[in-house]
Amino acid sequence: MRRYSLKHVLALFSFIFVVWTIFRYFPEPPAWVTELILKPLVWLAPTFWLVRKVERQPLSSLGFTTKKLFPSLYWGIGLGMIFALEGLLTNIFKYKGLNLIPLDYTPAFFLGTIGLSLATAFTEETVFRGYIFSRLRLLWKNEWLANIVASLLFALIHLPVGVFILGYTPGVMLSYLFLVFVFGLGASFVFSRTGNLASSILLHV
């Protein structure tokens, strides 16, 4: 018997949101500490606990599977390129040219950035697509309603970083949250097409 419950979904999100808001209020530690240690502890640990101990489901119920692996690669990389192109065009129109932040583009920097991006994508996609979206879809039997709600929650979880770390003005904040919401819709869409979390993780990276 499956033990999926809306209460579990809301409790998980509320816990992560409150703890993460408090964390973001304080000075930011190094990115690797946040993405490799703190975020997995706050986001992944309670998610895995819910799945294994409360729902008594395998982790494959989160989308950890080798099924439809190649379609997942196509969806994730293909839609990811579209999002990347959109971001590039936005940058060009905003600054009337290509405005890139000067960084130390060494192999070590590149590999470190990719590694942190993968860690971030793995954690966030496991929680929001693997758990929240998939459970809402199973409970409501409506993919798009589940997608919209999960994407709204995904945007909301990015509010603390926008307020406390990035210091966005209200107008910029709304634009930022809207873009995160749109990305959430795309990530849930590709995950729903494949049932493999690799698709949304690749899109996220």
Language-model segment annotations:
Residues 1-66, 87, 164:
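N-terminal, membrane-interfacial amphipathic/helix-forming hydrophobic leader that caps
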Residues 26-35, 58-123, 171-172:
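Juxtamembrane helix-loop-helix connectors linking adjacent transmembrane helices
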Residues 109-205:
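Transmembrane helix-loop-helix hairpins at the membrane interface
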